[in-house]
Amino acid sequence: MHCIGVDVSKQELVTYDGKKERIFPNARGLDEFTRFIKGSTDPMIVFEPTSTYSRRLEALCRRRQIACCQLNPRVVPHLRLVGKGRSKTDSSDAELLYRYGIERGQGEATQLENDALADESIQARLSCYRVVQKSRVAYQNVLEALSQDPATSSVLLDEVSEEIRELKRKEKQQIDAAQKLIEVEPVTKHRLELLLTIPGIGPITAITLLALFRKYGNANRSQIVALAGFDPIQIQSGTSVHGKSRISKRGNREVRRRLYEATLSAARYNPAVRSLYRRLKEAGKPEKVARTAAARKLLVIAHAIYKSGEAFSDQNQKEA
């Protein structure tokens, strides 16, 4: 197996294969890097996922079924501390990734599933939707302020109102585009329909959850909770340090936000979520604690339905 450590940046891929450092442009298609890979026998690529900058490399691994090891970005700084060097450069990071691949990568490497939605990601559409939504909310706040000022002309109010209507149209456009991507695969479309059967979960939350579940298809319940940042953290040391337990918040922030908002409806109409929410409130827990627990419960229910392929029912909730 030919191990290649790749440090990904916005413009370059810095690689190290145990013999030589090479630099390739991080351009659409990764043509130069692809030609280099073609000359390798049984390549294995070790890299850190860096959001949008590593998407092209991930897509290449999918298309060519190249084994890859996606290393948590928190690992490399620790490798640097225990190594000989302390400096951080793209070259040193590529070499650290290579050495990790030689020592442990073969047992951790996997082939990314060929995802028909990878080239035009659902996540990308959701990101565009969030940008438009923030702009729309900002304009609505401005309109509210201007409407209270008698000096504001009706022409300006009409212009801001028209801008809000246009942003709402763009929001719908992004969500419709995401749904069209989902409809490409009948199985994925069916799973989205299953998520929409859950009381409290609307189209945007369902699409957000679907993207998470698709990305981590092999994750179990505890892992998906951690990936959303709902896993608990305890702070305790000896007899003197006893901090309050809290959620880690190390996972997907957008998933947490969507689920937290969904609890407003789920706490009223979803029996299992309502029962948990009311029990915590009756026990004197703060509103934020009760809603966070309800959001975690909603995530677990949604994941159980996604994995089972069965529509929502009270039985699903009992098992979750």
Regions picked out by a protein language model, each given a short descriptive name:
Residues 1-18, 97, 208:
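Gly/Thr-rich phosphate-binding beta-strand-loop-beta motif of the actin/hexokinase/Hsp70
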Residues 18-44:
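Nucleic-acid-processing active sites and adjacent nucleic-acid-binding tracks
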Residues 37, 110-124, 152, 243-246, ...:
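Short, solvent-exposed helix-loop connector elements
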Residues 42-53:
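Short glycine-rich phosphate-binding loop at a beta-alpha junction
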Residues 70-194:
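Long, charge-rich intrinsically disordered scaffolds of nucleic-acid metabolism proteins
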Residues 203, 209-283, 287, 319-320:
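Phosphate-backbone recognition surface of nucleic-acid-processing proteins
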Residues 283-320:
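Basic, amphipathic alpha-helical segments enriched in Lys/Arg and hydrophobic/aromatic residues
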